[in-house]
């Protein structure tokens, strides 16, 4: 059963599960937070249909619902994610397409195989160049990518990398990213289908940041770096073409975020006063190159040009972290703090360790009582009761343990940092990049 607005998602999910004829009872949208009388009316109106779906001939129902197409309300006129999809198990290895760049892009766009921007045609020559002589098995299965359970083989990852504009030396990063995407802690099925405006952030650490020129300094989350832009876009291409995250079908983000095009940057170890990256904090060696994937929103800037002490800067950061509209406020989960080098240096000079920073934020970063609505309190009591403060204040903590806060140093000069909230019901995953 699902609401009419999300019938397309329900239909696509039945296909993902290998049951394209699974009957779906439809109720009017929206259904969230209806009063009991409204729920009763909807139930009365749908009960006959539910009985029919339970009792009618199973084969006839399968045939009926296999052919029943979802209404298309979006202006995006993509083909079905399962029609002519080059990542389907029975898809041909090669597609004979137009000879000109514009024609290829029109074809790929019409089939829903792009992010909307022009792609590099994945010709056999470009594919072979991407694979190189690394000894990789093109048929090796790296992961199954949710929600479509698409098979992310080395070959498919390489093809999507070509399309995104990646260079051959970016492929090991994409291979590691594909493995991380398949980890259950990331909860990719939710990230790739939710109405929340989240994306997959890729944080690159270790020697490879210099080897392939990953930007770790000025404009670190912005445009200008081929490695950052192309690797992040390659991950999005994998989520779309292998995972099935087609906007308006399985990807049901209400607003979305520009970070869904590409969100990839590197840790700035050279200007990290603690000499420890997030990857090292997670148990990896300084000599290892890694990629950490996180399910996040876009970054929220922290502008503090006037704080002279660690506590003054951390107070500003605390306030930025504490918005009642964040998923972290009522689902818990991780939240990332990316300290600009100047903020990091001031905090470090005041004697704060990374653990001290986390302790400060746990104690001082809380959502004030007056901005929490009663429905929000109800949800928080249900999901994160440990975050609610004593009745005297009535506010709520944004973090309760060190594991809730990820500390990163990145960016260039200037008194700015960034808070990056997460989807909440997700955990970061780190994979070693093997050249």
Task: Specify the residue positions occupied by each region the protein language model found.
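A charged, well-structured terminal subsegment
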Residues: 27-65
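Thiamine diphosphate
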Residues: 1-3, 9, 188
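Active-site-proximal loop->helix
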Residues: 5-20
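A short, charged, Gly/Pro-tolerant segment at domain boundaries
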Residues: 57-80
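Short acidic, glycine/tyrosine-flanked loop/strand segments centered on an H-E-D-like triad
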Residues: 17-25, 211-212
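Short, ordered loop/turn segments at secondary-structure junctions
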Residues: 2-6, 27-31, 207, 342
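Non-transmembrane, aqueous-exposed alpha-helical and coiled segments at domain scale
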Residues: 79-435
């Amino acid at each position: 059963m699902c609401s009419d607005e999300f019938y397309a998602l329900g239909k696509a999910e039945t296909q993902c599960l290998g049951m394209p004829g699974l009957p779906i009872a439809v109720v009017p949208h929206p259904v969230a937070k209806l009063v009991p009388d409204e729920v009763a009316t909807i139930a009365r109106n749908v009960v006959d249909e539910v009985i029919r779906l339970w009792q009618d001939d199973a084969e006839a129902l399968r045939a009926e619902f296999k052919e029943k197409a979802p209404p298309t309300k979006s202006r995006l006129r993509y083909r079905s994610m399962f029609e002519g999809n080059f990542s389907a198990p029975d898809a041909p290895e090669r597609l004979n397409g137009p000879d000109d760049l514009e024609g290829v892009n029109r074809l790929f766009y019409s089939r829903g195989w792009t992010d909307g921007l022009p792609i590099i045609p994945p010709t056999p020559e470009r594919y072979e160049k991407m694979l190189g002589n690394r000894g990789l098995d093109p048929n090796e299965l790296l992961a199954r990518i949710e929600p479509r359970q698409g098979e992310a083989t080395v070959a498919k990852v390489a093809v999507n990398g070509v399309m995104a504009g990646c260079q051959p030396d970016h492929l090991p990063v994409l291979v590691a990213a594909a493995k991380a995407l398949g980890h259950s802690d990331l909860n990719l099925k939710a990230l790739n289908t939710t109405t929340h405006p989240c994306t997959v952030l890729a944080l690159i650490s270790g020697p490879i940041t210099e080897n392939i020129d990953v930007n770790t300094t000025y404009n670190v989350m912005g445009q200008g770096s081929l490695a950052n832009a192309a690797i992040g876009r390659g991950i999005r291409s994998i989520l779309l073409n292998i995972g099935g995250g087609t906007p308006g079908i399985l990807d049901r983000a209400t607003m979305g975020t520009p970070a869904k095009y590409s969100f990839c940057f590197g840790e700035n170890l050279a200007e990290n006063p603690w000499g420890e990256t997030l990857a090292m904090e997670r148990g990896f060696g300084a000599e290892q190159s890694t990629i950490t994937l996180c399910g996040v929103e876009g970054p929220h800037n922290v502008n503090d040009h006037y704080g002279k002490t660690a506590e003054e800067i951390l107070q500003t950061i605390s306030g930025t972290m504490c918005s009642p509209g964040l998923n972290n406020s009522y689902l818990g989960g991780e939240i990332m703090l990316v300290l600009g080098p100047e903020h990091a240096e001031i905090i470090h000079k005041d004697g704060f360790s990374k653990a001290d920073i986390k302790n400060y934020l746990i104690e001082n970063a809380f959502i004030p009582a007056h901005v929490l609505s009663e429905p929000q309190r109800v949800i928080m009591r249900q999901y994160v009761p440990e975050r609610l403060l004593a009745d005297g204040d009535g506010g709520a903590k944004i973090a309760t343990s060190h594991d809730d806060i990820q500390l990163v140093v990145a960016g260039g000069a200037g008194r700015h940092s960034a808070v990056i909230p997460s989807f909440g019901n997700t955990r970061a995953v780190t994979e070693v990049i093997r050249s």
